[in-house]
């Protein structure tokens, strides 16, 4: 049988590849790297390559279809039966009525087209005739791509083998269940006439020497093949020989040795079954998808040069030519292509598979892709497969990295794979795309394939495709680990800016913080839209309140926005960033006692003193209005991080009120308990009683608070309800503090120690006018004079008479100052004599309205001047000092208060 293969191989031109070294009678040592650059060709059959046409994946010419008249009727019957009677798994749903009608329509069109086509007398090599006949064919008659024909060739062999009565094929059926359950069931059918063990060994050696990996040898060494005397169809050389005889004369004698007895097309191939991608499978998918989109000449040139050119050049050119390809493609064009595939099954019967093993693998992929699109026609969605730059760079740097497949269990696992499984892997990987869950069919599909079907593919596989082991099917554990690693590599954290420092770009805490900020900004935008929506619904409800109430009673959907779960800030371990003391911390290291009093002014708004921690137990009935972002990239045990409360670490051993400020209510209750529980010999017992009474503070916290409280009372001169502390210890310490600075007083929360102590307020209730018109020094003198008089005498009439004398004294002093000095009341005019400005004493009418009041000079104050508003009996008030315009912006502020708007404010002088 080997000699027959050799004689047939010598009779036709071919390229010498790893798969044809044994067939051409060459030595095994010839299989080196120089093998790719050598060829054995006969001058009578050398054909020149035509020019590469435009890259249009949808409009391509088709060769004149040829047909074998002897097999026309039989093939159409078999094809119609296969389209209707596909084997259905008991766990999958049957095809819908629309899908069945579509398949029947395709079958009828194929019958009509085959009857209308004549059968040529001579069968030529279609692969070489395509280029010559492409220009003579019209696009209306040939909407299908010519590179679909190798897939059709297998169907012809199936039809030939269907009539063979002497041999039965062994079929392995892969039942691919629902997409959610990745289960593979194997159904083995017994086979008559197993292989001879010697022939199996020889074929395995050929495949190994010719560059086909061990996984391809599993085609022969599978459990379906039983070694005995029948050599049947498993010899690769005889397979090719029989293939040529079928293509040449179409006699039924060669049908006994045809190896492709598969009913592969009879079942609906499920291209949507999810498959876990490994690195090898991803590269195979990228290469196939790119090849499917190339023009016919370019694709044939690539497949022809794959045996002679380096693998790395082909792979890099494919990846460079297409970085983004359309996976599904145009649904209408694919539909026509699939119909043409089913209508012309005999066209490819005249095409001979090359002995050198240069398969039209890309054509097969196109055919399978067209079938996939026709099955998914109700959902015409387009998806784009974007090649990851990292993956592309990896492929360019090491293109031959995957020449040998990944192994988990060694040769045992590879030999357990049947050729059916290898074909299944090919079909799944070709059609695999990022589809929607809704696009995945819910019914399981069945793939029935002959055990010897892949023998010729293993032989006819070029080196460029041999680098990707098609027969490799990784285990679930290996696939899951590779898939997880790929997700981690291809989906890095992108929450950083390009201008950030390198240390920040790869910092998980920084990325998590930016992610939280991004989510919060989105939630804020949504909240603004929700507020606008609420305002709109409010206006509509006010226009029709009765209808609005009726909708509420009927519980109808009004369209009100739903509340959001606000994302909380992530927990960050600040200890890893603040382990070493900086200059700022060294400077204020000795002032640590003041850190407990530090509180910003915006905390008075009502925010809790202690931030809500996710570690706090949730109360019953508490609405979960906050949510945390997932911490998938964080280290394990991140939820056990200790919490920081006001600069101090808090763990489970600390009380709930650890390092929290005392409220005003707690302080008042503490003062009451200090009076309730008198001092004891052992003060710790007193603190424990007070702590038990408070309920939320420990004895240690009470002792610390009472100590500070007593010091405050002692400094203020207020009696201490207990032992008086020694102020000498505390007075020795430096009193300079950031809190005492007048510029920092607004940054600190007022103390709660002296809440019950109310300082006295002194106010002159008899004469409010004196406070308005008198100088600040005069007001201070009056206050000091009144303080010298005891309170018990202030209600006597003598005290009131004394106050009147004081006022008269002040007026006389002011008059004397006015007469001795020259005073001009700028802006005031005498309403009687008309002198302007009034000099000396100005008399102002108190009874007239302020906007219409009259002013007189000192000489006209006694004249009986009357107007419509001013009467003679009105009371006049003397004004001794001129009221000039005073610009407060140029006055130095009194006291310790300040304003940044004051131009005279200089913080350096304070």
Swiss-Prot record:
Zn(2+) 1 binds at residues 830, 833, 857, 860. It is found in: Nucleus. Keywords: Acetylation, DNA-binding, Isopeptide bond, Metal-binding, Nucleus, Phosphoprotein, Transcription, Transcription regulation, Ubl conjugation, Zinc, Zinc-finger. The keyword Transcription regulation applies. Zn(2+) 2 binds at residues 845, 848, 870, 874. GO terms for cellular component: ATAC complex; mitotic spindle; nucleolus; nucleoplasm. Residues 687-710 bind DNA. Residues 41-117, 133-153, 303-358, 373-444, 609-641 are annotated as: Disordered. Its main location: nucleus. InterPro entries: Homeodomain-like_sf (IPR009057), Myb_dom (IPR017930), SANT/Myb (IPR001005), Znf_ZZ (IPR000433), Znf_ZZ_sf (IPR043145), ZZZ3 (IPR037830), ZZZ3_ZZ (IPR041981). Residues 654-714 form the HTH myb-type domain. Pfam families: Myb_DNA-binding (PF00249), ZZ (PF00569). CDD domains: SANT (cd00167), ZZ_ZZZ3 (cd02341). One of its GO terms (biological process) is regulation of cell cycle. The modification Phosphoserine is found at residues 89, 96, 137-138, 142, 613. GO terms for molecular function: DNA binding; histone binding; histone reader activity; lysine-acetylated histone binding; methylated histone binding; zinc ion binding. There is a cross-link at residues 283, 654, 715 (Glycyl lysine isopeptide (Lys-Gly) (interchain with G-Cter in SUMO2)). The modification N6-acetyllysine is found at residues 401, 708. Residues 67-84, 331-347, 397-434 have a biased composition (Polar residues). A zinc finger (ZZ-type) spans 825-884. Residues 96-116, 142-153, 613-622 have a biased composition (Basic and acidic residues). Component of the ADA2A-containing complex (ATAC), composed of KAT14, KAT2A, TADA2L, TADA3L, ZZ3, MBIP, WDR5, YEATS2, CCDC101 and DR1. Interacts via (ZZ-type zinc finger) with histone H3 in a methylation-independent manner and acetylation on 'Lys-4' (H3K4ac) moderately enhances the interaction. Histone H3 reader that is required for the ATAC complex-mediated maintenance of histone acetylation and gene activation. Component of the ATAC complex, a complex with histone acetyltransferase activity on histones H3 and H4. This is ZZ-type zinc finger-containing protein 3. It comes from Mus musculus (Mouse). The lineage of its organism: Eukaryota, Metazoa, Chordata, Craniata, Vertebrata.
């Amino acid at each position: 049988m080997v000699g027959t293969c050799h004689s047939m191989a010598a009779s036709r031109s071919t390229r010498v590849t790893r798969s044809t070294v044994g067939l051409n009678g060459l030595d095994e040592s010839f299989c080196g790297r120089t093998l790719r650059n050598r060829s054995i060709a006969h001058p009578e059959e050398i054909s020149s390559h035509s020019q590469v046409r435009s890259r249009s994946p949808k409009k391509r010419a088709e060769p004149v279809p040829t047909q074998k008249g002897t097999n026309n009727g039989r093939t159409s019957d078999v094809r119609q039966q296969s389209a209707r009677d596909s084997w259905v798994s008991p766990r999958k749903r049957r095809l819908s009525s629309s899908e069945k009608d579509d398949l029947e329509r395709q079958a009828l069109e194929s019958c009509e087209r085959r009857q209308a086509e004549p059968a040529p007398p001579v069968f030529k090599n279609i692969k070489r005739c395509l280029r010559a006949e492409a220009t003579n064919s019209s696009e209306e008659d040939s909407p299908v791509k010519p590179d679909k024909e190798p897939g059709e060739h297998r169907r012809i062999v199936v039809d030939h083998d269907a009539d063979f009565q002497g041999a039965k094929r062994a079929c392995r059926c892969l039942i691919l269940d629902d997409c959610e359950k990745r289960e593979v069931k194997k159904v083995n059918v017994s086979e008559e006439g197993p292989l001879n063990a010697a022939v199996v060994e020889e074929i395995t050696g050929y495949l190994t020497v010719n560059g086909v990996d061990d996984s391809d040898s599993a085609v022969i060494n599978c459990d379906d093949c039983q070694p005995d005397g029948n050599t049947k169809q498993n010899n690769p050389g005889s397979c090719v020989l029989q293939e040529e005889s079928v293509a040449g004369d179409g006699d039924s004698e060669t049908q006994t040795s045809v190896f492709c007895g598969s009913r592969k097309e009879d079942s609906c191939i499920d291209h949507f079954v999810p498959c876990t991608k490994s690195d090898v499978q991803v590269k195979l998918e990228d290469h196939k998808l790119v090849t499917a989109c190339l023009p016919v000449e370019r694709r044939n040139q690539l497949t022809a040069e794959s045996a002679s050119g380096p693998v790395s050049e082909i792979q890099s050119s494919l990846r460079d030519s297409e970085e983004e390809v359309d996976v599904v493609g145009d649904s209408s064009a694919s539909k026509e292509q699939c119909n043409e595939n089913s209508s012309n099954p005999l066209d490819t019967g005249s095409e001979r598979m090359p002995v050198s093993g240069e398969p039209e693998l890309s054509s097969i992929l196109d055919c399978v892709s067209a079938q996939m699109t026709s099955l998914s026609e109700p959902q015409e969605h387009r998806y784009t497969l974007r090649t990851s730059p990292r993956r592309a760079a990896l492929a360019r740097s090491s293109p031959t990295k995957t020449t040998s497949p990944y192994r988990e269990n060694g040769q045992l696992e590879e030999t357990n794979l049947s050729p059916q499984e290898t074909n299944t892997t090919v079909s799944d990987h070709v059609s695999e795309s990022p589809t929607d869950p809704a696009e995945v069919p819910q019914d399981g599909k069945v793939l029935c394939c002959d055990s010897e079907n892949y023998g010729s593919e293993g032989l006819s596989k070029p080196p460029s495709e041999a680098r990707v082991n098609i027969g490799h099917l990784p285990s679930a554990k290996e696939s899951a680990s590779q898939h997880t690693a790929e997700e981690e590599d291809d989906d890095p954290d992108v929450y950083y800016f390009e201008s950030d420092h390198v240390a920040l770009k790869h910092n998980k805490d920084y990325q998590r913080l930016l992610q939280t900020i991004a989510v919060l900004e989105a939630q804020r935008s949504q909240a603004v839209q929700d507020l606008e929506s609420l305002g709109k619904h409010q206006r509509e409800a006010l226009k029709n309140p009765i209808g609005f109430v009726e909708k509420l009673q009927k519980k109808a959907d009004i369209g009100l926005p739903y509340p959001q779960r606000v994302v909380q800030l992530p927990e960050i371990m600040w200890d890893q960033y603040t382990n070493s003391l900086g200059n700022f911390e060294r400077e204020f290291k000795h002032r640590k006692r003041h850190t407990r009093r530090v509180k910003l002014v915006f905390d008075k708004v009502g925010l809790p003193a202690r931030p809500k921690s996710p570690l706090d137990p949730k109360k019953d009935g508490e609405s979960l209005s906050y949510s945390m972002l997932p911490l998938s990239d964080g280290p394990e045990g991140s939820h056990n991080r200790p919490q920081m409360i006001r600069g101090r670490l808090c763990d489970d051993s600390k009380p709930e009120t650890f390092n929290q400020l005392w409220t005003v209510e707690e302080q008042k209750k503490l003062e009451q308990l200090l009076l309730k529980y008198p001092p004891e010999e052992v003060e710790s017992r007193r603190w424990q009683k007070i702590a038990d009474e408070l309920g939320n503070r420990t004895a240690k916290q009470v002792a610390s608070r009472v100590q500070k409280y007593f010091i405050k009372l002692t400094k203020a001169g207020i009696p201490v309800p207990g032992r008086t502390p020694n102020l000498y210890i505390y007075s020795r310490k430096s009193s300079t503090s950031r809190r005492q600075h007048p510029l920092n007083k607004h940054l600190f929360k007022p103390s709660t120690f002296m809440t019950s102590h109310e300082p006295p307020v002194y106010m002159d209730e008899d004469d409010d006018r004196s406070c308005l018109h008198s100088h600040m020094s005069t007001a201070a003198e009056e206050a000091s004079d009144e303080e010298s008089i005891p309170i018990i005498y202030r209600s006597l009439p003598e005290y009131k008479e004394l106050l009147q004398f004081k006022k008269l004294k002040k007026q006389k002093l002011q008059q004397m100052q006015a007469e001795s000095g020259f005073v001009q009341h700028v802006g005031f005019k005498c309403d009687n004599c008309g002198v302007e400005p009034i000099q000396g004493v100005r008399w102002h009418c108190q009874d007239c309205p302020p906007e219409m009041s009259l002013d007189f000079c000192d000489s006209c104050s006694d004249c009986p001047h009357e107007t419509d508003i001013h009467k003679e009996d009105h009371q006049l008030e003397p004004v001794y000092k001129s009221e000039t315009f005073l610009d407060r912006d140029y006055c130095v502020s009194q006291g310790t208060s300040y304003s940044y708007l004051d131009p005279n404010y200089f913080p350096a002088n304070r």
